């Protein structure tokens, strides 16, 4: 009984089980179909690689400009604002900030145009504002490198133009303020001179009325007041009036400092300033590997997909034959 049971169990096959050897035999017999499927898939992959647009990414790293790059701009700001001028470090941060904003705006514009272009700017190190990594995706390696350099220069020129315009506006405003200050000080000095002459003329009237022709006191600034000025005598007072009338206006040191500031501002030549809002840490690189399409990966996937499709055709065809035979 035990032997018979063993024989029966050994001959009992489950029809639902997959016979791997049988599958391999079927695939081997249908190898030409699989090979043809793989060849077709490879041909399609090669066709795709031939017509697909290549993508190459050129990258550059920038940071805030050096002190030497903004020396002229810093000097102009010192002339315009004097002691209130911003520090060099503040100017550096402001310039790279304006460059980053203008670059981001350009990237947004390129992304929204009909034929999109991918231009990006982002921090090189996470949680650090500087340096910045800028990149451009082009259809050729040389084109991506050239375009990135072109857009960086374009943004720098734009920022430069904006800074020159701001400087010209600030120079015009500073010149007007200084000219107004000079006019005010000149008016005050003229009024002081006129007041002095009127005071002497009034003292001369008193001296004539008192018939004082000769000095009755020593002429010292500490002793003489408006009330005792007539004691200098009419002769001295008449001479003083003539002297005061031809005497140039007397100004404070602040007046001459204001004039010097005005001359300095008027001598500024904004058009000659060469302002750069950034400095290269790494210039636009020439990419050596394209982003897409990847030839090796595409061909490998084509072989795998072609093989899978071919195997599916072989197994499906055999399954259909077996079904029809039943």
UniProtKB/Swiss-Prot annotation:
InterPro entries: Bact_polysacc_biosynth/exp, LPS_length_determ_N_term. The lineage of its organism: Bacteria, Pseudomonadati, Pseudomonadota, Gammaproteobacteria, Enterobacterales. Belongs to the WzzB/Cld/Rol family. The gene is wzzB. SUPFAM superfamilies: Bacterial polysaccharide co-polymerase-like (SSF160355). Residues 1-31, 317-326 are cytoplasmic. It comes from Escherichia coli (strain K12). This is Chain length determinant protein. The keyword Transmembrane helix applies. Its main location: membrane. It comes from the Bacteria.
């Amino acid at each position: 009984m035990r032997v018979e049971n063993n024989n029966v169990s050994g001959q009992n096959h489950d029809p639902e089980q997959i016979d791997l050897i049988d599958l391999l035999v079927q695939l081997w017999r249908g190898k030409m179909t699989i090979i043809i499927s793989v060849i077709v898939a490879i041909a399609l992959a090669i066709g795709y690689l031939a017509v697909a647009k290549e993508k190459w990414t050129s990258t550059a790293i920038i940071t805030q400009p050096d002190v030497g790059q903004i020396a002229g701009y810093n000097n102009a700001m010192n002339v315009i604002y004097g002691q209130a001028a911003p520090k060099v470090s503040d100017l550096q941060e402001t310039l790279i900030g304006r460059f980053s904003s203008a670059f981001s705006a350009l990237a947004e514009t390129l992304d929204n145009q009909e034929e999109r272009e991918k231009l990006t700017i982002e921090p090189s190190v996470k949680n650090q504002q500087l340096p910045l990594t800028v990149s451009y995706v082009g259809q050729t390696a040389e084109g991506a490198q050239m375009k990135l350099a072109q857009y960086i220069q374009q943004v720098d020129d734009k920022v430069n133009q904006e800074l020159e315009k701001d400087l010209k506006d600030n120079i015009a405003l500073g010149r007007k303020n200084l000219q107004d200050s000079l006019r005010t000080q000149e008016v005050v000095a003229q009024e002081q001179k006129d007041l002095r002459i009127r005071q002497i003329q009034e003292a001369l009237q008193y001296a004539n009325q008192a018939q004082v022709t000769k000095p009755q006191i020593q002429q010292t600034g500490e002793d003489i007041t408006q009330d005792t000025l007539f004691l200098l005598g009419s002769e001295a007072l008449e001479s003083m009036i003539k002297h005061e009338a031809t005497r140039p206006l007397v100004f404070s040191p602040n007046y001459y400092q204001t004039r010097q500031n005005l001359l300095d501002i008027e001598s500024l030549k904004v058009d000659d300033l060469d302002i750069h809002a950034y400095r290269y840490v790494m210039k636009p690189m020439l990419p050596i590997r394209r982003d897409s399409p990847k030839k090796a990966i595409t061909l490998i996937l084509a072989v795998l997909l072609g093989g899978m499709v071919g195997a599916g055709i072989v197994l499906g065809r055999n399954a259909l034959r077996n079904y029809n035979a039943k």
